[in-house]
Amino acid sequence: SFGTSALGDMPDTYGYSVNEGRARETINAIFDSECNLIDTSRNYGFGIAEQRIGQVIQERGGLPDDFVISTKLDRNMKTQKFDAARARKSIEESLEALKVDRIGLLHLHDPEHCKDITEITSPNGSLAELFKMKEEGLAETVGLAMGKTELMLEIIKEWPFDAIINHNRFTLLNRNADELYSYAYSNNISIINAAPYASGVLAKGTEKSRLIAYSEATDQELEPVKELEKICDKYSVPLPAAALQFSLNDKRISSTLVGVTKPKRVSETINLSKFIIPNEAWEEINQLPYSTHDVEAARQYKPG
């Protein structure tokens, strides 16, 4: 599956801009590919990502057959308010922007950043509103998309979610989401593992990127990546192929979500998913140490 946060033009997060023309070409490439899920959010680029997807859907005369839109209810980014009324406003904005009358997979997004968690978890909060939207037919399935795995685990134990999205916390470098994924899998909650490239460095390598989980990495933090690069070079394996297939090969994970910003990245990603990696390479990769801490613990969240 493919993610569209950068297609909302978020230079504060990614360090570069994506203009409308390139974004729309990329969205068309996603719709024309063999994948069947596109993920976005009300707050990606303050609504720009959804708007661009909606324009493409309108131009194509509707969503492709059997294609799933995954989007997210978001808090008010100015006030951080995330009560039921804000959740209702968020879905209304999404439906209008995306040019659809229902959402295939609708998540509650980033509750850890809201002003007051009780606005979300109370009996009349935004979570209850999310499930009401499913009852009303505005969403076919509902999920929880967030980062902090401990809070995420608490919430999914209390509510009957169909799916979850977690990002940056189950990669070749980090396994912070391992317990969360085991619980979700054993309770029939579909898992979408996002950001298998650790937000950059596992796609581009240490020569071109120092980004790990949207932050500049130290030399020490880059050492495990360099060890991975040595193994991949030894077996002539592209580093991003190993990073992607690490997620794809985990039986618990239903879908691996990769952000793309150029049309050619869609076909390149699909090709990486099919690259044949020798067992000897996996044996060496699997012996490397990894982190289990929250890789985004010190991240300064930037909405743009």
Model-derived regions: residue spans:
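Structural motif corresponding to the early beta-alpha repeats
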Residues: 60-81, 109
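Active-site mouth loops of central-metabolism enzymes
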Residues: 7-21, 73-86, 117-118
